[in-house]
Amino acid sequence: EAANIKACVESILAQDYPSAAFEIIVIDDFSEDDTAFIVQALSQQFPQVRLLQLKDHCKEGETLAYKKKAIEIAVSVAKGDWVLTTDADCIVPTRWLFLYNAYIQEHQPSFVAAPVMFIKTAGMLNQFQLLDFLALQGITAAAVGAGKHSMSNGANLGFEKAAFIAVGGYQGVDHIASGDDMFLMHKMKQTLHKPVGYLFHPDAIVLTAAMDTWKGFIMQRIRWASKARYYDDRSITVVLTLVYLFNLSFLLLALLGSWSTLIIALAFKTFFELFFLEPVAKFFKMKPELRFFACYQPIHIVYNIAAGLFGQLKTYSWKGRKVK
């Protein structure tokens, strides 16, 4: 993360918001690069920047959920009433804090999800990830708007510190490697009597780097899919199962050689998904990318099937760690 952390912290420091009204807490998760050194240097220049070392609170190998542990530590020392999270490879917009504050004051929520998008670069892999992530972001916003609260992304979310403490933080899900975002969202929705909201504003979009290899992309998606078995909300499990079976049906049609049926089904799938994605792409200013959407349908179907399967069965690698 050393290549990204300085730009990330500087984007937060550049907020259109009073510097005395927020602090930046960076948790160093056993990094072996210059991340800690870079943050320490920034903290000497900017007093609102604080560096915490995860190694001072737990031993490596002591937990699977390093990020959850890091967030719990940060919350325990945070001075404010609200905590916003992002990742070291992210860039936040200048009105990020202002927009969160305005949303919180108006809606009085316990948890707020917000938009994330990959940085656009050249190449087929990046283009595919942009389209895939557009769909995920659209589903996230639509689900929260419908009161289902099934998805969120730790690169851009906020929660009330008192609400975090009230639900016991990550207690009960701290044995699961991923899910620092969605499991917390689910706990707050199920336990508290305060709304869970979505900050739907183009000036709140956090940008993050996409995977630069197909292997990295697949491992990331397997990691995301691995959370599904732990969901308490049966409606989410049912929807995910139906989506998986829907994608599997296309593979079965191909294996059976039912090409005419497959082509018609793909055409209907593409039409309805484009209908859903058009306003999402407009929000993220990525409508030109939709012209490639139909071309990536076969890859999208196969990867969804593979990620869903291996997410439940396979040990995966993430940031140099083997995780089951």
Features from the language model and the residues they span:
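Acidic donor-binding segment of Leloir-type glycosyltransferases
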Residues: 9-60
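Acidic metal-phosphate-binding loop of nucleotide-sugar-dependent transferases
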Residues: 32, 90-91, 157, 182
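Acidic donor-binding/catalytic loop of UDP-sugar-dependent glycosyltransferases
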Residues: 33-34, 88-103
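Glycine-rich, basic loop-to-helix element that forms the pyrophosphate-binding segment
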Residues: 56-78, 99
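Short aromatic/hydrophobic "clamp" motif used to bind/position activated sugar donors
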Residues: 83
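Catalytic donor/gating beta->alpha subdomain of glycosyltransferases that bind UDP-sugars
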Residues: 104-137, 162-165, 171-236
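Short glycine- and hydrophobic/aromatic-rich loop-to-beta-strand nucleating segment
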Residues: 149-159, 163, 182
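Membrane-embedded multi-pass helical conduit in multi-pass membrane proteins
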Residues: 236-315
